[in-house]
Amino acid sequence: MTVKSLHVTAMVKYLLLLILGLAFLRETAAQRVPKEGQTFFQKPESCPSVPEGSLKLDLGIINANQRVPLSRNIERRSTSPWNYTVTWDPNRYPSEVVQAQCRHLGCVNAQGKEDIFMNSVPIQQETLVLRRKHQGCSVSFQLEKLLVTVGCTCVKPLIHHVH
């Protein structure tokens, strides 16, 4: 797993959140009535109409070269270490999604040994991706929620007392 792949995944998350925000703003702006002297962006009448709920999107990332600093080898240094795997889906944007998988059921102590009295659990983040839909000769994209495991953490185990 490279830092570049992690950076691209993070950038795609932010892009999808921005798309959702823009779609929401478009919807709320359409419902507002401008006050006297106030104007909202209005599409020229010569422009073709766009179907309700659709949005034109350029998938290029404006600041793609901007780097987000990442901690070095955090997945190996954690008391709950994990490995990365890449899932691939050609009908999803992004087509590559990086997932973390916990290495142990227990946590790693200061001596590097697994402590089975603690639990290693996944940290999950719900994110939005674009799902490609084929309709005859045309292709469209629809937002889809995806649960991504981004790392693991060490927790005290749940203890159930039987009475």
From Swiss-Prot:
Gene3D superfamilies: Cystine-knot cytokines (2.10.90.10)
Source species of the chain: Callithrix jacchus
Primary location class: secreted
Subcellular location: Secreted
Family statement: Belongs to the IL-17 family.
Signal peptide: 1-30
Pfam families: IL17
GO CC term, one of those recorded: extracellular space
Lineage of the organism: Eukaryota, Metazoa, Chordata, Craniata, Vertebrata
Quaternary structure note: Homodimer; disulfide-linked. Heterodimer with IL17A (IL17A-IL17F). Forms complexes with IL17RA and IL17RC receptors with 2:1 binding stoichiometry: two receptor chains for one interleukin molecule. IL17F homodimer forms predominantly complexes with IL17RC homodimer, whereas IL17A-IL17F favors complexes with IL17RA-IL17RC. IL17RA and IL17RC chains cannot distinguish between IL17A and IL17F molecules, potentially enabling the formation of topologically distinct complexes.
Protein name per UniProt: Interleukin-17F
Keywords attached to this entry: Adaptive immunity, Cytokine, Disulfide bond, Glycoprotein, Immunity, Inflammatory response, Innate immunity, Secreted, Signal
Cystines in this chain: 102-152, 107-154
This protein's record includes keyword Cell inner membrane: no
Keyword Transferase: no
Function: Effector cytokine of innate and adaptive immune system involved in antimicrobial host defense and maintenance of tissue integrity. IL17A-IL17F signals via IL17RA-IL17RC heterodimeric receptor complex, triggering homotypic interaction of IL17RA and IL17RC chains with TRAF3IP2 adapter through SEFIR domains. This leads to downstream TRAF6-mediated activation of NF-kappa-B and MAPkinase pathways ultimately resulting in transcriptional activation of cytokines, chemokines, antimicrobial peptides and matrix metalloproteinases, with potential strong immune inflammation.
Gene it is expressed from: IL17F
Sites where a glycan is attached: 83
GO BP term, pick one: inflammatory response
